[in-house]
Amino acid sequence: MKKVFTFCFLFLYYVVSLYADKTINLFVIERSKNANIVKYDAILTNTGKINEKNPIDAYWLLYAKKNGEREELSSFDKKAYGFKTNYNKEKDNFDFVLKAVKDKPMILGLYNNVPKAVIKINNIDCFLEKVYIESKDGALGIPKVSYYELFGKEVSTGKAQQQEILVK
């Protein structure tokens, strides 16, 4: 009886996993304010394609006080760390704008069947790995961004690229 139960459980787990969406890390945002990071994951369907209706999951990883615990972005957080995507059916990818770096549009697509966010770093197409945001406390305690840095690897060569962008 125990073997039958174990088999049924494993079979059910396997079937559910076939139809469940999977997530793969795209990049993170680190900030000078504290150790918490914002993580962006691509959401893949069970066929390995990026989910057209809900392509990205963005959330906090709380390292400052909660040992890396996950927390959803609030409505207020989304004003700074949210994003917009638009599916391009012809190219089978997404135009992607991150509010934190809205002047640097991206493309979200599959490269060798792995989801990647492509952004221009030093005018070179790169796979984005990390954004670092340096900020100071502004009026009413709302942080004011001084600059941000983009970190990635060139799409064509894999060479590391980094660019600091001052915010006016």
Predicted regions and their residues:
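Mature extracytoplasmic domains of secretory-pathway proteins
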Residues: 60-128
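Bacterial Sec-dependent N-terminal signal peptides
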Residues: 1-23
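Short, ordered beta-strand-loop transition motifs
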Residues: 31-35, 88-91, 101-102, 140-144
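N-terminal export/targeting and maturation segments
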Residues: 18-77, 160-162
